[in-house]
């Protein structure tokens, strides 16, 4: 029986794309910082001159799937991380954005056979988002770990 798992020891060989929503940038900037910190600590070059990590900013989480799709067609990535923050308001807009963003990201990932980490915070309040972006825990770090694991796993399977 063969058992396959992702590895955290060869992360420095990965090529990572990050698509990030500018909407709620107080939150998304913090998530991005946590994500980049994790990637750097695992051996990836996150400097501005890096050839390992590319960052694409989009207006909001709804636009993440098309940016990820375009990015993946342009260059070869081992994994893409989609970052955003959608906070529930008084209308149904929240439900539409989350539904379409999650479906779109999943579809793009499956069509391209490249993992996309769903790093879109979905919270009811700004306080909850702040807690997940650094006050108590920075989920950006977790999203980067998932990216390292999945990027490594897919490389091993191929």
Swiss-Prot record:
The keyword Transferase applies. Pathway: Cofactor biosynthesis; riboflavin biosynthesis; riboflavin from 2-hydroxy-3-oxobutyl phosphate and 5-amino-6-(D-ribitylamino)uracil: step 1/2. It is an enzyme of class 2 (transferase). (2S)-2-hydroxy-3-oxobutyl phosphate binds at residues 90-91, 132. It catalyses: (2S)-2-hydroxy-3-oxobutyl phosphate + 5-amino-6-(D-ribitylamino)uracil = 6,7-dimethyl-8-(1-D-ribityl)lumazine + phosphate + 2 H2O + H(+). Its EC number is 2.5.1.78. Belongs to the DMRL synthase family. 5-amino-6-(D-ribitylamino)uracil binds at residues 23, 61-63, 85-87, 118. Disulfide bonds: none annotated. It comes from Prochlorococcus marinus (strain MIT 9301). GO terms for cellular component: cytosol; riboflavin synthase complex. One of its GO terms (biological process) is riboflavin biosynthetic process. GO terms for molecular function: 6,7-dimethyl-8-ribityllumazine synthase activity. The active site is at 93 (proton donor). Keywords: Riboflavin biosynthesis, Transferase. This is 6,7-dimethyl-8-ribityllumazine synthase.
């Amino acid at each position: 029986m063969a058992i396959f798992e992702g590895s955290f020891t060869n992360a420095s060989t990965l090529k990572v794309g990050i698509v990030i929503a500018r909407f709620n940038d107080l939150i998304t900037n913090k998530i991005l910082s946590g994500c980049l910190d994790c990637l750097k600590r695992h051996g990836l070059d996150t400097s501005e001159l890096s050839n390992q990590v590319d960052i694409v900013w989009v207006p909001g989480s709804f636009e993440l799937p098309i940016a990820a799709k375009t990015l993946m067609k342009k260059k070869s990535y081992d994994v893409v991380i989609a970052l955003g923050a959608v906070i529930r308001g008084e209308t149904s807009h929240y439900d539409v954005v989350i539904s379409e963003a999650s479906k779109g990201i999943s579809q793009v990932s499956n069509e391209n056979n490249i993992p996309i980490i769903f790093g879109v915070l979905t919270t009811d309040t700004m306080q909850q988002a702040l807690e997940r972006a650094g006050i108590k825990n920075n989920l950006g770090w977790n999203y980067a770990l998932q990216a390292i694991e999945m990027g490594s796993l897919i490389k091993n399977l191929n």
